Structure formats: structure tokens, C-alpha cells
A protein has these predicted regions:
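N-terminal glycine-rich "phosphate-gripper" loop used for MgATP/nucleotide binding
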Residues: 81-92, 111
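ATP/NTP phosphate-donor binding region
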Residues: 1-78
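Conserved anion/nucleotide-ligand pocket segment
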Residues: 126-160
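Hydrophobic structural segments
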Residues: 42, 73-75, 94, 120, ...
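Short, acidic/small-residue loops that bind anionic groups at enzyme active sites
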Residues: 98-120, 127-134
């Protein structure tokens, strides 16, 4: 069975991307800053969801705070992509009674615990990227970083 997918608009320098923390609380701010530096060096504008630095136990805020952050970024008409800050645990809890607002689709980028969010988008036919979260991006080899941006900016992937 083949699912028809809608691809969000390809990104370009000057686009606004949001940092969202849907899973574990941020623990390594240095790694996050390095990831942000990569996005900024490519000309992207960065916004931070309201609760991205919150902490509730091991999570990046309560379920409601994290859900509001996700909704804030998804609903912002100027936002072109959501950069998940890190994985861990807790994203699937946000999907209980969750409905994606019907807006122009945006890229959601992450892996690990974020996979549930990516699958929920796939179920409604929106493509996303199972790729580095913000706190792991700088530790990816250059070829991996290049492939991420080749896809997000041009929709092209060269064979490995």
C-alpha cells in the first residue's frame, strides 16, 4: 500500500523555524547552541516555543505545556519547520486527543521519541524528517548534515 504524501514547502534561508521540546527536558544547552549555530549559519531565523526550557520531572514541561508548544509552532503561519530539541520520552503522551490544525504543512524534524509525532503526521499524509534533533545535529558527520539540508532545501538526496 502506498500512501500519498504532501511535502511541506522546501526551506530557504530567511525562513522561520521553531524550536520545540516535545520530549525530555533540555540537559545539554551547549549541544543545542551548536545545533542552532548550524541552522543560523545557513540563514534561518529561529523562534522558540513558549515552554521549550520548561522542566517537569524528566520532561520538558507538563503534557499540556508541551502540547501548547507544539500547537503554537504548528499554528504559526510564518513557521516553516519545527526543530525538535531532543528525544527521550513523552512525545506520544501529547498525541492523546490531538488533532493537527489544518494549516499549510511544515517540516517536523526529529527521531527517537519524536517518531510518534512523525507517524501521526504520516497518517494524515504529511511528510516529515526522521533526522537529527537539535541537540545531536552538530555531532552528525558533515555528509549527514549536508543530506539533511539537501533534502529540506532542494528535495534531493544523492546515494550514499
Amino acid at each position: 500500500m502506498s500512501l500519498p504524501f504532501v511535502y511541506p514547502a522546501w526551506l530557504k534561508p530567511g525562513d522561520l523555524v521553531y524550536v520545540v521540546a516535545t520530549s525530555g527536558a533540555l540537559r545539554n544547552l551547549e549541544a543545542m547552541e551548536k545545533g542552532l549555530d548550524i541552522w543560523r549559519s545557513r540563514g534561518y531565523n529561529i523562534a522558540f516555543s513558549q515552554y521549550y526550557r520548561s522542566k517537569w520531572g524528566y520532561l520538558a514541561g507538563t503534557d499540556e505545556e508541551r502540547r501548547q508548544s507544539l500547537a503554537q509552532a504548528w499554528g504559526d503561519p510564518d513557521c516553516r519547520a519545527l526543530l525538535c530539541a531532543r528525544g527521550g520520552y513523552g512525545s506520544s503522551r501529547l498525541l492523546e486527543n490531538w488533532q493537527w490544525e489544518k494549516v499549510a504543512p511544515k517540516w517536523v524534524i526529529g527521531f527517537s521519541d519524536v517518531t510518534g509525532i512523525l507517524w501521526s503526521l504520516a497518517r494524515i499524509g504529511i511528510s516529515s524528517v526522521h533526522g537529527p534533533v537539535l541537540t545531536t545535529l552538530a555531532s552528525e558527520p558533515p555528509w549527514s548534515q549536508r543530506r539533511l539540508f539537501d533534502w529540506l532545501e532542494k528535495g534531493q538526496l544523492e546515494p550514499i
